[in-house]
Amino acid sequence: MFSGNLKKQIMSIKQYEIWIADLNPRIGTEPGKTRPVVIVQTDLLNKIPHPSTIICPVTTNVKENTEILRIHLKKGTARLNQDCDIMLDQIRAIDNRRLIKKIGTLPNDVIDRIKENIEIILDL
């Protein structure tokens, strides 16, 4: 499952970047497969480096009328190759060895929406 090593654990990860991650094995309703994820963990932890990272998975199974639980990304945003949704309701921590490679960084307008929606979802 993990092909990571010590070098991979100390890689540079920044909040609101999109990375490819191996989310297998999945359990129940968790998203699995190798897929893009958004790093939502604070850079205070990302700089340590912390051994795990809080992420939101990204899916190509785009849904309508999910303004709070999902944020739609158009093809080309942060170098994504198709339309996608960030699944904010699937926020979770993963071991850094699941992270494979960085794809891109989200624009400020999407970052602002992520912050607002996570505040609503978690009642912060």
Provide a role label for each language-model segment.
Residues 30-34, 38-75:
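Compact nucleic-acid interaction/catalytic patches
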Residues 2-11, 76-124:
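C-terminal terminal-subdomain/extension
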Residues 27, 62, 94:
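Feature marks short, surface-exposed loop/turn motifs that line or immediately flank catalytic pockets
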